[in-house]
Amino acid sequence: MKVTLIAILTCAAVLVLHTTAAEELEAESQLMEVGMPDTELAAVDEERLFECSVSCEIEKEGNKDCKKKKCRGGWKCKFNMCVKV
C-alpha cells in the first residue's frame, strides 16, 4: 500500500515538473520564432534608456537623492541608464 502511494505521488510530481518545463520551452520557442525586427528591438532599448534617466532627473529636481529605477528582464540601471546585464 505504501509503495503504491509513493509511486503515485512520485509520478504526479514528475508529471507536474515535466509539464512546467514543457510550458517554459514552448514559451521560449514562440519568442524565438516570432521575434521582433531589429528596429523594434532598438525602440525597446531606447525606451529603457529613456525611462531610467528620466526617473532620476525627476527625483533630482525635487532635491532628493536619485534612486535608481529598477530595470527588469535582464537590465540594470547604471549611470542613469538601463544596461543589459
From Swiss-Prot:
Function: Postsynaptic neurotoxin.
Propiece span(s): 23-48
Organism of provenance: Cyriopagopus hainanus (Chinese bird spider)
GO annotation, cellular component aspect: extracellular region; host cell postsynaptic membrane
This protein's UniProt keywords: Disulfide bond, Neurotoxin, Postsynaptic neurotoxin, Secreted, Signal, Toxin
Pfam families on file: Toxin_20
Compartments (UniProt record): Secreted
SUPFAM superfamilies: omega toxin-like (SSF57059)
Keyword Signal attributed: yes
Family: Belongs to the neurotoxin 12 (Hwtx-2) family. 02 (Hwtx-2) subfamily.
Name of the protein in question: U4-theraphotoxin-Hhn1k
Tissue expression pattern: Expressed by the venom gland.
GO MF: toxin activity
Disulfide bonds: 52-66, 56-77, 71-82
Region forming the signal peptide: 1-22
